[in-house]
Curated annotation (Swiss-Prot):
Family assignment from sequence similarity: Belongs to the UPF0229 family.
Short name of any one Pfam family annotated for the protein: DUF444
Protein's UniProt name: UPF0229 protein PC1_1960
NCBIfam families, A to Z: PRK05325.1-2, PRK05325.1-3
Biased composition (Basic and acidic residues): 77-90
Record-linked HAMAP family: UPF0229
Superkingdom in the source lineage: Bacteria
Region (Disordered): 46-109
Protein species of origin: Pectobacterium carotovorum subsp. carotovorum (strain PC1)
Length: 424
């Protein structure tokens, strides 16, 4: 009985290469599906895996087939209903697209969309691809770690896509030379002895036969040494290394006043959860300062920021003043990259909006690397938006976006933190 031993190191992930190729090939369709799916998740379920669906029309392989129309002659085996020149009635209806829209029909056929599961890491990689903190500046002071993938020699374990053919063949050659060096040396000596014995008189037939038999056995032993073995295989190794990058702090300012209903607060929380995941995924150490405000501003921890029920009136400048105080006390602008993300419904005491403009223009914007304002409302913009519009026209490090409903959150997030090209 023959026994087969599976010595492959990635036996449980034999389709890894095909999966990676599939993700690369249909990245645009997968990202589109992810951007649609993220808005359907609960606030606390942002970072798990995801079931991704792709229309079958997008993954069909090219193929040659007969064009529609025209006349063709075919031989159909087993035909006992039609003869030459009979007209075959065209089928009613047509192939469905699997979208589930439209009226039902007893005719036609179609296919469902192709659905597959991506892991948490694949999901987050695609979710935050091509995003970065704007204007991040490196300094000579205390640093945070930003991780990037680098080549790191070779390893005996890996996936087939990373195999190093040259290094594996070098190991194979070295192993075969080491395992057969003694046998080849003995073989060479026996061949020389046989050659000398062949020229001696009288002929020593028994000795010659013995030498030939030993030579044959040695050649068979040498031939049995495998050309390549799993021990020879070497794979290109990659590791994530901490890259020196200036330390940064992100201020999250959220309006929790009475005008912010629960749906608006949930959308603001979704935005901040995306921001938190983006920072924790791409940067090792980034300080995050959470500030909630109504008529008064308060620095809180993560738990209170997302789950506290406290509410009140609206004075936006209280949050800006508190942010300035925290910066002065703990974050020297010469040593820190300072960022801020403010979310509000735009409702503010009318006399306070000009004060917000003044604080941002004179105190905060000269100190920060980037300040983003997100207004979450379906109503028309009020004085705060108009005051901020003048700041956007004056300061390059100030950005503002409008979120009307849940579907706008992820596109707005990508717009605010998309990686800037060299030309920008």
């Amino acid at each position: 009985m023959a026994y087969f031993i599976d010595r492959r190191l990635n036996g449980k992930n034999k389709s890894t290469v095909n999966r990676q190729r599939f993700l690369r090939r249909y990245k645009s369709q997968i990202k589109q599906s992810i951007s649609e799916a993220i808005n359907k998740r609960s606030v606390t379920d942002i970072e798990s895996g995801e079931s991704v669906s792709i229309p079958n029309a997008d993954i069909n392989e090219p193929m040659f087939h007969q064009g529609r129309g025209g006349r063709r002659h075919r031989v159909h085996p087993g035909n006992d209903h039609f003869v030459q020149n009979d007209k075959i009635e065209r089928p009613q209806g047509g192939g469905g697209g699997g979208s589930g829209q439209g009226d039902a029909s007893k005719d036609g056929e179609g296919e469902d969309e192709f659905v597959f599961q991506i892991s948490k890491d694949e999901y987050l990689d695609l979710l935050f691809e091509d995003l970065a903190l704007p204007n991040l500046k490196k300094t000579q002071h205390r640093q945070m770690n930003e991780y990037k993938t680098h080549r790191a020699g070779y390893t005996a374990n890996g996936v087939p896509a990373n195999i190093s053919v040259v290094r594996s063949l070098q190991n194979s050659l070295a192993r075969r030379m080491a395992m057969t060096a003694g046998k080849r040396r003995t073989l060479h000596e026996l061949e020389e002895s046989l050659e000398q014995l062949a020229h001696t008189e009288p002929a020593q037939l028994l000795e010659e036969e013995r030498l030939r038999q030993e030579i044959t056995e040695l050649r068979q032993k040498i031939a049995r040494v495998p050309f390549i073995d799993t021990f020879d295989l070497r794979y290109k190794n990659y590791e994530r290394r901490a890259e020196p990058s200036s330390q940064a702090v992100m201020f999250c300012l959220m309006d929790v006043s009475g005008s912010m209903d629960q749906a608006t607060k949930d959308m603001a929380k979704r935005f901040y959860i995306l921001l938190y995941l983006f920072l924790s995924r791409n940067y090792k150490n980034v300080d995050v300062v959470y500030i909630r405000h109504h008529t008064q501003a308060k620095e809180v921890d993560e738990q209170e920021f997302f789950y506290s029920q406290e509410t009140g009136g609206t004075i936006v400048s209280s949050a800006l003043k508190l942010m300035e105080e925290v910066v002065r006390e703990r974050y020297d602008p010469s040593q820190w990259n300072i960022y801020a993300a403010q979310a509000s419904d735009g409702d503010n005491w009318a006399d306070d909006s000009p004060l917000c403009h003044q604080i941002l223009a004179n105190q905060l914007l000269p100190m920060v690397r980037y300040y983003s304002y997100i207004e979450i409302t379906r109503r028309s913009h009020q004085t705060l938006w108009r005051e901020y519009e003048t700041l956007r026209d004056t300061f390059d490090n100030f950005a503002m976006q409008h979120i009307r409903d849940q579907d706008d959150i992820y596109p707005v997030f990508r717009e605010l933190f998309r990686k800037q090209t060299v030309g920008h």
